[in-house]
Amino acid sequence: MATLIQRSLSLAKSSTPALQFLRFRGKINIQRPKAPHYERARVVAVTQPKYPELPKAKSCFKTRAERTQQQQENPYNEIIAREVRNWLDHSRLVAFFHLSSITADDIFRVRVQLHKQNLHLKSYGSKIIEQAVKNTRYEAIVPLFHSNHCIVFSPDPEKTAALLRIVRRVPQMVLLGGIVEETMLSRNQLVAYAQMPGLHAVQAQLVQTLSQAPGHLIQQLQAHQNSFVQVLDVHAKNQMNEETPKST
């Protein structure tokens, strides 16, 4: 009885067959597909949309600029252009860089280092830059954005030296020029400006110079009187020396 139960249990066990999927026919020809059936081809031909053709006078004699002028600009570009204009108006230091081949990790590290110095690294498209500075005093910077670029903004112009020190470690960022205190500067002028002393140091030198001027003036006014007093003192001492032997 036990042997019969064991045999029945072995037969009752489920077995998973090995399946292997095979294509019934050869590979599908994607480049030169087989022509569809006549009925299907007729349905496809009937359901194809038909667009009205433009008159030849409009398509031939109308320039490409006139045809594309009717396209509506993306409103998001206007928002970004206003943001660029806001950065330009409220930044006392603006530096323009040409970006060579550089990885995203390197850009991120440079962005973090600049942010610690209150310097903000931004990148915009050339069309957005052109839309932002059109008919403004910043229109002269448009030729700088024909290739890959980035812009650094800062409200503090004294950060120019820190900016050049950070960018010196990244050869992929090439300085083109900048705007400092609403004045357009070239690369060499920007480097020379960074080497100038700070405003507080110059103010201290001016205060020191102004404080030295009154003392120098008083010294010059009293120079003749002091020299005359010294001459009289020497003359009095000589007379006293001459009178002393006579009295003895």
Curated annotation (Swiss-Prot):
GO terms for molecular function: structural constituent of ribosome. It comes from the Eukaryota. Coiled coil: none annotated. Gene3D superfamilies: 3.30.70.1730. It is found in: Mitochondrion. It holds the Pfam family Ribosomal_L10. GO terms for biological process: mitochondrial translation; translation. One of its GO terms (cellular component) is mitochondrial large ribosomal subunit. Keywords: Mitochondrion, Ribonucleoprotein, Ribosomal protein, Transit peptide. Signal peptide: none annotated. Its main location: mitochondrion. Residues 1-24 form a transit peptide. Component of the mitochondrial ribosome large subunit (39S) which comprises a 16S rRNA and about 50 distinct proteins. Belongs to the universal ribosomal protein uL10 family. This is Large ribosomal subunit protein uL10m. It comes from Drosophila melanogaster (Fruit fly). The gene is mRpL10.
